[in-house]
């Protein structure tokens, strides 16, 4: 297994992996499968290009993408971990940890000492995983954009000095 930041040539793998994630766990993400499927190929090509504002990471088993995560800089300057997903058969095999580590390192490399994410506390497995990765819950809640009836809570990771 290896993990790397995407490049423009990875757009088809990024698109396929993201759409698979949105079908597999539709209530875990702020975007819907329908909205992501409507993106033009040019949009996916642009998304695959890594920048300090947005970097997607793909995990691969040989040449097959098996997981995804991204670092996105929000308009308020917060650095976010988003789009975290691993194919079912690869869960529990350190793929998710590798993806989180890649996003953390990307954030640090871009000058951030703090990384945030949103998770539904009812998603016990995900919340426990993020806590093991050093994230802590903050008293901040909001509705999930794709499913407004679901409330997500912000979690935060801070780089140790």
Feature map (PLM): residue ranges:
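C-terminal "cap" of GNAT-fold acetyltransferases
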Residues: 113-116, 120-127, 132-161
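Conserved G/P- and acidic residue-centered "switch" motifs that form tight phosphate/ATP-binding loops
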Residues: 94
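Long alpha-helical, hydrophobic tracts
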Residues: 1-4, 8
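Acetyl-CoA-dependent GNAT
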Residues: 8-9, 15-89, 100-102, 106, ...
């Amino acid at each position: 297994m290896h993990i790397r930041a995407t490049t423009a040539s990875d757009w088809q793998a990024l698109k396929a992996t993201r759409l698979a994630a949105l079908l597999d766990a539709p209530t875990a993400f702020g975007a819907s499968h329908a909205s992501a499927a409507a993106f033009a190929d040019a949009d996916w090509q642009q998304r695959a290009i890594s920048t300090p504002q947005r970097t997607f990471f793909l995990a691969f088993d040989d040449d097959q993408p098996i997981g995804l995560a991204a670092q996105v800089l929000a308009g308020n300057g917060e650095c976010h971990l988003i789009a975290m997903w691993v194919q079912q058969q690869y869960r529990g095999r350190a793929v998710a940890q590798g993806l989180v580590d890649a996003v953390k390192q990307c954030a640090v490399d871009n000058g951030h000492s703090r990384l945030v994410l949103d998770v539904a506390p009812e998603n016990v497995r995900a919340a426990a995983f993020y806590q093991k990765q050093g994230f802590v819950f903050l008293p901040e809640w909001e509705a999930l954009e794709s499913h407004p009836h679901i409330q997500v809570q912000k979690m935060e990771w801070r780089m140790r000095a």
